[in-house]
């Protein structure tokens, strides 16, 4: 998406994934941790004036609550099963009152939730038979509320280990 935005003249020097992976325009948008560390070390070296790495993220807002649940897929063909779960979630979320599917998303299904002042992202892991579920909310108890609703949907899939969501109701 960052490449497309830049081609349209939108200044987009960095692409970030929910997992924390990042890619810089000046490194051809390669997901390169060594390059990122080199950039951070340069900033540390420049910090001789008393500034520090934390200053780079001053002003970024943090949600009141945030949680990641890592849901294991127990089916042998975990990739196809995960794709099915995401497809069904996309269909379900599009019809559910108070849920708004984020159209410009490239990592699974992201849904904004009215009332919880938050959102969730459910996606496939790139490497493991996992479906990470990230939830953020700006109201007390919002993560729990969103997780309970998502779990209600996921209960229909016998090929998911919903243990990480146990205790949510």
What are these regions (language model features)?
Residues 1-134, 139-169:
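Phosphate-binding and adjacent anionic-ligand microenvironments
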């Amino acid at each position: 998406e960052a490449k497309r935005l830049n081609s349209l003249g939108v200044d987009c020097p960095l692409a970030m994934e929910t997992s924390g992976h990042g890619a810089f325009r000046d490194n051809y948008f390669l997901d390169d941790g060594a390059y990122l560390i080199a950039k951070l070390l340069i900033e540390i070296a420049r910090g001789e004036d008393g500034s520090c790495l934390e200053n780079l993220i001053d002003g970024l807002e943090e949600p009141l609550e945030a949680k990641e649940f890592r849901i294991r897929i127990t089916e042998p063909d975990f990739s196809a099963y995960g794709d099915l779960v995401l497809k069904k979630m996309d269909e379900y979320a599009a019809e559910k009152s108070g849920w708004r599917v984020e159209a410009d998303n490239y990592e699974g299904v992201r849904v904004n939730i009215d009332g919880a002042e938050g959102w969730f992202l459910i996606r496939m892991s790139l490497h493991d038979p996992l479906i990470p579920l990230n939830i953020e909310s700006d109201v007390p108890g919002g993560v729990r509320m969103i997780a309970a609703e998502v779990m209600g949907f996921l209960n229909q899939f016998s090929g998911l280990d919903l243990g990480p969501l146990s205790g949510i109701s």
